[in-house]
Amino acid sequence: MLRIWSLFCFFITFSLQAQSIEQIRKSYTIAQNSKENTAQFYQLMQEVSSEDIPIKRAYKGASIMMYAKYSVKNVRELLKEGKEWVEEALNKEPENIEIRLVRLSLQEHLPKIVPYHKNKDEDKKVILDSFYSQSKLLQKYLQDYIQSSKSFSPEEKKRIKN
């Protein structure tokens, strides 16, 4: 079983170069459902480098921060490293609402003890203000998150409904 798992992880990691943002989004969406999904997402994003596009760097940061949840040691280091990846991506593209969504979702789900919650209102505003200028595919992804999020009010959720 371990051999099959290792082989699976190898192929996932190897195929990252050919992966689309849509495939990464799907993996990110299910990563929070289980430890195994988180580990798969973390492995998938390991090939992302500082030379990749900012959105991939943001997802890499998210994978590191999510992986910290299951780490026995180095939790602080993983959280710090993940945050650096996300913030660096946002510094490169501050108006990218998908990067804003990644940061918002992390801040929404991290325990209150982790000091990474101060940008939620700012990110919500950028997401809501720019929602209709995005592609239909990205709008659907954003809408799915917003409808399930506790950070958005019922009025804000209505605002982006079809």
Question: Which residue ranges define each predicted feature?
Answer:
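N-terminal leader/linker segments that initiate helical-solenoid repeat arrays
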Residues: 18-42, 48, 57-59
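Bacterial Sec-dependent N-terminal signal peptides
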Residues: 1-22
